[in-house]
């Protein structure tokens, strides 16, 4: 049936069934009258009849309201400001209030809270000549402290990427002057998907789209900052233990890195990821790749043992580490160098995987309009270096790469140095993608990336190393208890192995092993409180906690099981 609406802009029509709610016809009316305030609409059955607020008719069927095919309703309303003007006002006011609220409400990592309070200014050392010239307290222009994002200083120190907090302070100095007006979130979160909150007069995507809700063309740029500057492995034995399955079987290995973040003094306002444990999920290793077979956690199901163990020990997921090793066949332990400047550093498959993982582990930030910005999740590769030695390399992918992964725009190719931009479908909108390159005349030009895209534009390199004075969180030694999921090389976790490990030393020292803790957690013998106490014993090693653990019911039940 057709209902007619007479307004000062003419007669409008809306189609509805007798059993439909009046809301169906009202929605069509408001779409045909976009520049009005819907809250002011009133309806009458005659030009001089009593006007009824339209809101009172909503929620009732057309039939119940006594409306028939061809009936005409007379519409009155108040004109509102043009939509563009309303959106302009909203854009100027609402985001400022929202950004300030998000800034104050967002809970960041402790390392971020600490670093954002530091000014990061770099003090220059005075030469003997400058000390004679200016005195101990005097300063010339070339001896004043410099900002942590100073390009000349970073170049002098051979720092390729400024730190995340230096980047935030640089943007903040431009966006929010000390005596300026309202607060503006300095970080810009890339979003290459179709807007789902478009106010245009069309059906939501994928049924409809307009120039306001479709994403703009993407111009890829090398990222000038990095979210993490350095990866520190708590002890070198951790890497040796991780590559042992490759040494015995020749197959590759993957693991999840757990640890915490600390300030990194060698980069202004830098952050380092300190790896305390590597958990090896269930996997099927091949000579040239890996398939993770660990069952994904279902909604409402208990957390996997390694995640629950990490949380109990105060650790967070830091990243992923995997091997790509091929023996050189020289009989001296040397390996083939596959990754270098003339081939690739991370393959397109690995870049796509890293982008998806970083999008899965977003970084909380008070300086983002969404409370999240990029990720601190890192990717570490153990492979051969140009000297034929086994070495570690650490990377992240850019924030733009994360956004492209979220929007389902990229996929790997058979060429390891080239990503592919996916084709558009009915449900996937693909904007134009460009990147800058030097042409045959040495000029910088924009190159279309549809469909191929060099992976170099996505990579951010990190440094790595080991502490000079190792003080690992877990002290029982990596050989004290079998590592999980190593059945391929004849290594199995069992109650007998647990009993042997616990008999090897004091309770406090014997349980200080991440793999042992994860195994105990998987047994389900200890209560949540008892396991939390066990984790505290393993990480803090206090005598009073050991006494409480030994006296607990769950611990004694565990000892009975493994006897």
From Swiss-Prot:
Its main location: cytoplasm. One of its GO terms (molecular function) is K48-linked polyubiquitin modification-dependent protein binding. Pfam families: NPL4, zf-NPL4. It is found in: Cytoplasm, Perinuclear region; Endoplasmic reticulum membrane; Nucleus membrane. The keyword Hydrolase does not apply. The keyword Nucleus applies. Keywords: Cytoplasm, Endoplasmic reticulum, Membrane, mRNA transport, Nucleus, Protein transport, Translocation, Transport. It comes from the Eukaryota. Coiled coil: none annotated. One of its GO terms (cellular component) is nucleus. GO terms for biological process: cytoplasm protein quality control by the ubiquitin-proteasome system; DNA replication termination; endosome to plasma membrane protein transport; mitochondria-associated ubiquitin-dependent protein catabolic process; mitotic spindle disassembly; mRNA transport; nonfunctional rRNA decay; positive regulation of protein localization to nucleus. It is a peripheral membrane protein. InterPro entries: MPN (IPR037518), Npl4 (IPR016563), NPL4_C (IPR007717), NPL4_Zn-bd_put (IPR007716). Residues 231-373 form the MPN domain. Involved in the import of nuclear-targeted proteins into the nucleus and the export of poly(A) RNA out of the nucleus. Has a role in the endoplasmic reticulum-associated degradation (ERAD) pathway. Belongs to the NPL4 family. This is Nuclear protein localization protein 4. It comes from Yarrowia lipolytica (strain CLIB 122 / E 150). The lineage of its organism: Eukaryota, Fungi, Dikarya, Ascomycota, Saccharomycotina.
């Amino acid at each position: 049936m057709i209902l007619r609406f007479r307004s000062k802009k003419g007669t409008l029509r809306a189609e509805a069934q007798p059993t439909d709610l009046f809301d169906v016809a009202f929605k069509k009316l408001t779409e045909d009258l976009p520049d009005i305030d819907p809250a002011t609409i009133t309806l009458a059955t005659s030009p001089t009849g009593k006007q009824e607020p339209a809101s009172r008719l909503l929620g009732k069927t057309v039939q119940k309201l006594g409306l028939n095919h061809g009936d005409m309703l007379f519409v009155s309303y108040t004109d509102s400001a043009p939509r563009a003007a309303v959106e302009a006002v909203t854009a100027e006011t609402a985001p400022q209030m929202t950004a300030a609220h998000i800034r104050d409400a967002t809970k960041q990592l402790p390392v971020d809270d600490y670093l954002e309070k530091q000014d990061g200014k770099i003090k220059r050392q005075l030469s003997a000549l400058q000390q004679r010239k200016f005195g101990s307290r005097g300063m010339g222009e070339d001896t004043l402290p410099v900002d942590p994002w100073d390009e000349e200083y970073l170049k002098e120190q051979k720092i390729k990427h400024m730190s995340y907090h230096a980047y935030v302070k640089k943007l903040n100095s431009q966006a929010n002057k000390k005596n300026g007006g309202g607060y503006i979130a300095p970080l810009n979160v890339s979003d290459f998907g179709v807007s789902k909150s478009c106010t245009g007069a069309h059906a939501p995507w994928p049924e409809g789209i307009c120039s306001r809700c479709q994403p703009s063309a993407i111009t890829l740029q090398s990222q000038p900052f990095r979210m993490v500057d350095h990866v520190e492995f708590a002890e070198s034995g951790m890497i040796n233990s991780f590559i042992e399955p490759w040494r015995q079987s020749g197959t590759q290995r993957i693991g999840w890195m757990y640890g915490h973040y600390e300030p990194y003094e060698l980069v202004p306002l830098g952050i380092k990821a300190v790896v305390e444990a590597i958990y090896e999920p269930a996997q099927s290793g091949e000579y040239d790749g890996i398939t993770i077979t660990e069952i994904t956690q279902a909604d409402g199901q208990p957390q996997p043992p390694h995640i629950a163990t990490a949380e109990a020990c105060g650790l967070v997921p830091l990243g992923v580490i995997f091997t790509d090793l091929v023996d050189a066949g020289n009989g001296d332990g040397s390996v083939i160098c596959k990754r270098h400047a003339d081939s690739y550093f991370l393959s397109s498959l690995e870049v796509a995987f890293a982008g998806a993982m970083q999008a899965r582990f977003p970084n909380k930030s008070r300086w983002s309009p969404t409370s999240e910005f990029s990720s601190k999740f890192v990717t570490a590769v153990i492979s051969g270096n140009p000297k034929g030695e086994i070495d570690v390399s650490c990377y992240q992918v850019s924030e733009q790469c994360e956004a492209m992964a979220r929007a389902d725009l990229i996929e790997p190719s058979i060429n390891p140095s080239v990503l592919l931009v996916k084709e558009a479908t009915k449900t996937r909108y693909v904007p134009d993608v460009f990147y800058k390159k030097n042409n045959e005349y040495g000029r910088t030009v924009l190159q279309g990336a549809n469909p191929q895209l060099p992976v170099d534009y996505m990579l951010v390199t990190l440094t790595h190393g080991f502490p000079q004075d190792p003080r690992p969180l877990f002290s029982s030694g990596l050989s004290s208890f079998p590592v999980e999921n190593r059945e391929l090389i004849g290594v199995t976790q069992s109650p007998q192995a647990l009993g042997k490990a616990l008999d090897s030393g004091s309770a406090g020292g014997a349980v200080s092993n991440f793999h042992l803790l994860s195994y105990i957690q998987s047994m389900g013998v200890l209560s949540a409180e008892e396991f939390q106490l066990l984790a505290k014993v393993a990480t803090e090693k206090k005598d009073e906690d050991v006494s409480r653990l030994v006296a607990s019911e769950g611990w004694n039940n565990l000892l009975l099981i493994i006897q």
